[in-house]
């Protein structure tokens, strides 16, 4: 349970005005709901207000999720003769060639489209840690997925091994499902692919996915090493074919107990994105006050490609 405001140190809880009956700090949906459904409905109402405010200010907004990540209760839906999922070390991986997996994926997308009909982008993220322990050869015993693998594995020349190629084909199938579903719904939302920037995550698959996916799908990728390293050089090559967004980190989530001076990182990474002819940069963060200098630097160079202030001048 969250800490009660009355227990905040040094009587700082006195500055918070809480709704009647609430003991913790948070939005009304979190602290006044009496059921899970009420909580979800209030959260969605709040996000509809956020979307409305964004559009009033000329800001476009994306919503999405990690594809192929579903609640464990759903795996009981498996039926005889259908290879719905493969077992991993600590989770189960849905098979995108299974009709059950496809319908669950469509339902998640439809929930966003129905709840936020004016959403600008649907952002699909390759799962950060989904494939540990999957037996690729066992997975390829499913004939529909095996056919997809044989047809598309050669696209992923940069992948390190058969397991990485497996993930590439798996991601490709999910992105194809998403793209076709958005078209079938007549949605105006554009599709974005995103993922983590580690060497065994999205970067090694991006060129293969670029070869296979329609060019109106936007590619994005978190910068590697919790943002301490710049975006890969090959994004410049992909940017010749489609819109590409780099994703610098205003702060890393492994050190949120202190300030993280990243002014020079933001300066260099945003300037590099301009040199690579990337279509955009998106910054991620957890806190709002602590990374303010990093954010100001990010915004300065993102809004003016000609900016060239030194780090000393920025501070």
What are these regions (language model features)?
Residues 308-315:
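Carbohydrate-binding surfaces of carbohydrate-active enzymes
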């Amino acid at each position: 349970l969250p800490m009660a405001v009355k227990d905040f140190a040094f009587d700082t809880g006195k500055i918070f005005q809480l709704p009647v009956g609430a003991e913790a700090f948070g939005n009304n949906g979190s602290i006044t709901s009496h059921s899970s459904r009420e909580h979800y409905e209030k959260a969605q109402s709040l996000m509809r207000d956020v979307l409305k405010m964004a559009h009033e200010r000329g800001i476009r907004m994306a919503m999405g999720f990690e594809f192929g990540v579903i609640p464990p209760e759903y795996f009981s839906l498996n039926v005889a003769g259908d290879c719905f999922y493969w077992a991993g070390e600590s989770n189960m991986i849905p098979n995108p060639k299974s009709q059950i997996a496809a319908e669950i994926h469509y339902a998640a997308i439809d929930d966003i489209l129905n709840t936020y009909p004016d959403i600008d982008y649907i952002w699909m993220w390759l799962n950060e840690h989904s494939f540990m322990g999957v037996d690729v050869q066992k997975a390829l015993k499913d004939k529909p997925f095996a056919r997809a693998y044989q047809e598309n594995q050669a696209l992923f020349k940069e992948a390190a091994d058969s397991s990485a190629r497996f993930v590439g084909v798996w991601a490709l199938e999910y992105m194809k499902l998403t793209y076709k579903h958005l078209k079938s719904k007549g949605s105006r939302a554009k599709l974005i692919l995103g993922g983590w920037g580690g060497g065994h995550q999205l970067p090694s698959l991006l060129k293969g996915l670029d070869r296979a996916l329609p060019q109106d799908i936007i590619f994005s990728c978190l910068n590697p090493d919790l943002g301490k390293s710049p975006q890969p050089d090959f994004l410049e090559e992909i940017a010749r074919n489609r819109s590409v967004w780099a994703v610098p980190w205003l702060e890393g989530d492994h050190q949120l107990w202190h300030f993280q001076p990243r002014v020079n990182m933001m300066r260099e990474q945003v300037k590099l994105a301009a040199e690579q002819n990337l279509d955009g940069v998106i910054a991620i963060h957890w806190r709002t006050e602590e990374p303010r200098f990093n954010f100001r630097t990010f915004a300065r160079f993102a809004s003016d490609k000609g900016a060239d202030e030194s780090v000393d001048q920025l501070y």
